[in-house]
Design a protein with these regions (language model features):
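Short, acidic Ser/Thr/Gly-rich low-complexity loop/linker segments typical of extracellular
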Residues: 180-197
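Short, ordered, surface-exposed loop/turn motifs in non-cytosolic proteins
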Residues: 149-183, 457, 586-589
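Short pre-active-site segment immediately N-terminal to the catalytic Zn-binding motif
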Residues: 328-344
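Acidic, Ser/Thr
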Residues: 62-70, 81, 580-582
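Proline-centered linker/hinge motifs at extracellular inter-domain junctions
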Residues: 40-44, 96
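Non-catalytic extracellular/lumenal accessory regions of secreted precursors
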Residues: 493-574, 582-584, 600-607, 647-651
Length: 651
């Protein structure tokens, strides 16, 4: 199953993206004072000897001679003060590096180093100069084209990848380096264009090799748009995959040097060397996804993203924890994702939702026919709709190996699920709780092909405008209701056709609001009072509200596991919230409180039948509560799943 990694784990409760899909942690520190009146002598910084370098070479600054007369050096802080701006890697270490910029004439760069000792005293700044010389005169451009081998799917939808027929495609936007053939020092760096072409200048009569890096980089020394996206094996402390064809040639050569990256996989699907093209196939799908966003907003600043291909086997997911990254599978004997473009673009959709919109999706396993928590239904449905939009292909395919044959699962986001049960596949039918309804609606909003109930053809820009605008700030949870309400408000001329499209998915459109307040449809597999109302309204100082929690559709992230409550504070005040569960088998009731999409507080004590928190001086406004018993609403389930009542009061 495709799933997201939870972004916040409290008492065994997986709650993704409670604080914008992530969360910071702080620790209690300690302080000490010394007695005896000793005076701390400031440390002494040494930035090393002045250096000379050639454009394109990696330069290492050296602060290792810094010292503290009566203690130790605790930290280093390097800054550039003069010259063409460069990006320092490891600017808080003793030996940071940077790539000498391309210059036409000799240029001096100056760097400053300040060190701090173990008692907090800082040194006077020490400086060092690096003179960067232009490449030798008489140089000519080294040019070429980079391509990678993509393995296509077999024509039959139930068959998987056709390893016998790889296709060379341009490797777009990737870093290319000229390496000195002997020392392997980087002499020049550039990026390929949208056809895979590259060119750079190196010193005349130099033997070089060309290295391709699985990284797209446009850093803060360049105007918007910017990005830094890489594919590597693992997340912390590793470098991107690279490929070199091992060919050395003279920089004076008049012919282009093309690089064709092979799959490293035999026709039968077994490894036949280094699987070289995989990282570049992944990165090319990421490139295509970024172009979709740039077509809507040409000045987008993309946060750094790592794609981890190879280090884990726990499904595919996006997580903002630590370094934002997408995890993909790489097991040829079972499931590998480098050529599954819809899978990659789906996870990139979660990255987009997290960084530019809002992702209230709590994550967890999901599949066709599941009746999901409406936040999960929207997040996962958006992911596959976004993938189809990026690739302009409504047929999503996911390859795997069944032990004897290459296989694939597939579905068409263009095909509206049937509105009656059991549906095909079984249980797959129109619902606000269905990811298939969400992806069908969003695809039909985008595409320009008219079909049954679909006369909408808005393209991607209106979808993007809703995501970065009202969907980001909605006081409701992000669901199909909040999205469609905003889409209609921003596209008044298309309201009638949008209503027709949405109504075909068993969703009420008359007087629709962001909360789905007027919704009357629910799947027959879940009791009506466990699905509706979608939000129960609690009155401050009023009586308790009672809501069923059920596991009829499954546990963790399925419809009826968790219940939503709304309450409003008319003025700033202190408010106490109490929740309890009727579960007689080791109950564990928990709840989370939100305001305007932001996590406010929550109750996550060890298993207990009742939980209570107090919000001190809570500002006026509307609040949402996500309340559940861990027997039904946690991943993994804790206790005995079943049908219980949740009782909640707000005072």
């Amino acid at each position: 199953m495709r799933h997201l990694t939870p972004g916040l784990t409290l008492a065994g409760i997986a709650a993704l993206l409670l604080v914008a899909c992530g969360g910071g942690g702080g620790g209690l520190g300690s302080s000490s004072s010394s007695s005896g009146g000793a005076t701390n002598t400031p440390p002494i910084a040494s930035a090393g000897a002045n250096q000379t370098a050639t454009s394109g070479v990696i330069v290492t600054l050296n602060g290792t001679a810094s010292r503290d007369p009566d203690g130790t050096i605790a930290s280093f802080a390097w800054t550039q003060t003069v010259g063409t701006a460069v990006t320092l890697t490891g600017g808080t270490t003793s030996q940071p590096t940077f790539t000498a910029p391309l210059v036409a004439v000799a240029t001096t760069l100056t760097f400053s180093l300040v060190v701090t000792d173990n008692l907090g005293s800082t040194s006077p700044a020490a400086t060092v100069s690096v003179t960067v010389n232009a490449p030798a005169s008489g140089n000519g451009n080294v040019t070429g084209r980079v391509t990678f081998a993509r393995v296509p799917f077999s024509a039959s939808l139930n068959l998987g990848l056709n390893y016998a027929s790889p296709v060379q495609q341009p490797s777009r936007g990737v870093l290319v380096r000229a390496l000195d053939a002997g020392s392997q020092v980087v002499l020049a760096t550039t990026s390929t264009d949208n056809l895979g072409n590259y060119s750079f200048t190196v010193a005349a009569n130099t033997m070089i090799t060309v290295q391709v890096v699985a990284r797209m980089l446009r850093d803060n020394t360049q105007a918007l748009p910017r990005w830094d996206m890489r594919v590597q094996d693992g997340v912390p402390g590793v470098t991107p995959y690279t490929y070199t064809d091992g060919v050395s040639f003279n920089s004076n050569a008049a012919t282009a040097h093309d690089v064709a990256i092979p799959t490293g996989i035999a026709a039968n699907g077994t490894a036949a060397g280094v699987r070289a093209s995989g990282p570049f196939a992944i990165l090319d799908t990421v490139y295509q996804a970024t172009q979709t966003i740039l077509n809507a907003d040409a000045l987008t600043n993309f946060p750094a993203l790592i794609v981890d291909w190879g280090s884990q086997a726990d499904g595919t997911f996006f997580t903002p924890q630590g370094s934002q990254h997408i995890a993909l599978l790489a097991d040829l004997t079972e499931d590998t994702d480098e050529f599954d473009q819809h899978v990659i673009a789906h996870e990139f959709g979660h990255y987009i939702e997290f960084n530019y919109s809002r992702a209230d999706n709590i994550g967890g396993a999901h599949g066709l026919g599941d009746k999901l928590d409406p936040r999960v239904a929207f997040g996962e449905g958006f992911g596959y709709a976004f993938a189809a939009i990026v690739l302009n292909d409504p047929v999503a395919r996911d390859s795997f190996f069944d032990g004897t044959t290459q296989r694939s699962s597939s579905f068409n986001v263009e095909t509206n699920p049937p509105t009656s049960q059991p549906g095909n596949p079984i249980g797959n039918y129109g619902c606000w709780c269905s990811e298939s309804s969400v992806w069908s609606i969003l695809w039909d909003v985008y595409d320009n092909a008219a079909d049954t109930n679909d006369a909408v053809a808005l393209g991607f820009l209106p979808i993007w405008d809703v995501l970065i605008g009202p969907e980001r700030t909605t006081p409701a949870f992000t669901t199909i209701f909040s999205f469609i309400t905003a889409l209609k408000a921003q596209n008044a001329g298309a309201v009638a056709t949008i209503n027709t499209l949405v109504a075909a998915q068993n969703i009420d459109v008359t007087n629709m609001d962001a909360y789905g307040s007027t919704e009357t449809h629910f799947p027959s597999t879940v009791p009506s009072n466990a699905a509706l109302p979608i939000y129960t309204v609690a009155t401050v100082g009023g009586g308790a509200v009672v809501m069923p929690t059920v596991n009829d559709a499954g546990e963790s992230n399925k419809l009826g596991n968790r219940r939503f409550v709304r309450f409003t504070l008319g003025a700033t005040r202190t408010t106490t919230i109490t929740a309890s569960s009727s579960n007689p088998n080791t109950p564990d009731v928990d709840f989370l409180v939100f305001r305007n999409g932001a996590f406010v507080n929550g109750a996550f004590n060890p298993p207990a039948a009742s939980e209570q928190i107090t919000l001190t001086n809570a500002p006026a406004g509307e609040y949402l509560i996500d309340v559940y018993d861990c027997a039904n609403g946690c991943d993994p389930s804790e206790g005995t799943p079943g049908d219980y009542n949740l009782t909640l009061t707000v005072n």
